[in-house]
Amino acid sequence: MTSDQSLSHHEPLPLERLGRTHFVGVGGGGMSGIARIFLSRGVPVSGCDARESRVLAALRAFGARVTVGHDPAHLSDVDTVVASTAVPPTTPELAVARERGLPVLPRAAALASVMAGRRGVAVAGTHGKTTTTSMVVRALQRCGADPSFAIGADLGEPGSNAHDGTGSIFVAEADESDESFLLLPFHAAVVTNVEADHLNHYADLAAIHAAFDRFVAKVPDGGFLVACTDDPGAEEIASRAARRGTVVRRYGTSPRADVRLVDLRLEVAGSRFAVAMDGTVLGELQLRVPGAHNALNATAAVAVTVGLGFPFSEVAEGLADFTGARRRFQPQGEVAGIRVFDDYAHHPTEIAATLRAARVVADGGRLVVAFQPHHYYRTADFRTEFGAALALADEVVVMEVYAPGETPLPGGTGAALAAAVPLPGSAVVFEPSWSAVPEHLAARARPGDLIVTMGAGGDVALLPPLVLDALRRRWQG
């Protein structure tokens, strides 16, 4: 999808006009959730993905007709196609759909169709979208609102990334990667931060800012924008929106924040802090997820939910119950005093935030990290920044880049990234064979250490159980 201001004026298509809908790339976090809501609302759904997964199994159990592999034969009785951004537009299935004149919708257009008619909350930002969206959902659930939601990761068991609730509110993670978040209808918007990313789509940071400006310009009369004033990019977006007359609620640690995080105490098991709104302390929050970044995410959730009229006391209870989303610094197990966590971080800022939190959780133990870069272009663009972020660990195993269908770029390979990590040579290794990574990690870790597997997808997501097996072989015989 190219940059187009008309995107922000697109009207969602009514579900009843879509007919039988086929999701190409249905195994993705965002796609699978939307498919579930389609099914909940009586829309016949089929779908396909490149590999079998627990997500596909859960969709079948929910009533979808799901197959493995891409094949134009899947389109025999289809009225509408929804395409994942992860699936190249040249995929034969999509090419044949267009040849036949079938509507081919981006994921966000399908999401807009299920959000229509609800009081939408759209959570956007370069980092923290999934966790912040999840926190807003948990808080609203504790308040008895039964919101509908679509999130990019499960909150527990497979299929828990989406729900068609009975309440009037729909909470959605808004993906800025291709500007399709401009299709979403909403009452309140959240911008957690704005940094350079997705430079395969955007020309530069200025183009990213322009997209976010158009996104927040969609806040309607009576709605509001919540933005992190601690982040320079989000503050720029908020300032311009305020000058246009948008109601803006800033959050953060800065004295200029309308909803302010104060007295932050980071702990091994999470954090404690107070929240003040317009100068008045609302009360204290206790989180079960670690890191200063998660305290900020929770403050955003407070700003949204209290802004929607819900009581802080119940919001705080909901946030206290939040234990995280899948692959967001998610504990995987422990062997011989060595704990294993898995995380989705795939941008230098995310890696640094996760490793700072992990350092507190490690409580004196060392950090041993396996990282799989995602996309050659991102690795080349941010190689130096990736190196600096990974240097917050004690030992690092860099895997080959996960970039299906892409051509390697100079400076964008796993080997180039490993060379950019400013740690002693023995502390960094490039391992091109993902199946060898578990033994590398097991050999480097010792009791008291914390292992973190990191990356957006591909092979790294398969590692945690294999790492635990390798640790058992080494430490338990």
UniProtKB/Swiss-Prot annotation:
Q: What is this protein called?
A: UDP-N-acetylmuramate--L-alanine ligase
Subcellular localization(s) per the UniProt record: Cytoplasm
Q: Quick one: which pathway? A: Cell wall biogenesis; peptidoglycan biosynthesis
Among InterPro entries, the record links this protein to: Mur-like_cat_sf (IPR036565), Mur_ligase_C (IPR004101), Mur_ligase_C_dom_sf (IPR036615), Mur_ligase_cen (IPR013221), Mur_ligase_N (IPR000713), MurCDEF_pg_biosynth (IPR050061), UDP-N-AcMur_Ala_ligase_MurC (IPR005758)
Q: Which species is this UniProt entry from? A: Acidothermus cellulolyticus (strain ATCC 43068 / DSM 8971 / 11B)
**What Pfam families has UniProt attached to this entry?**
Mur_ligase (PF01225), Mur_ligase_C (PF02875), Mur_ligase_M (PF08245)
Q: What is the lineage of its organism?
A: Bacteria, Bacillati, Actinomycetota, Actinomycetes, Acidothermales
Task: Name the EC number(s).
Answer: 6.3.2.8
Q: Name one GO cellular component term.
A: cytoplasm
The family this protein is said to belong to:
Belongs to the MurCDEF family.
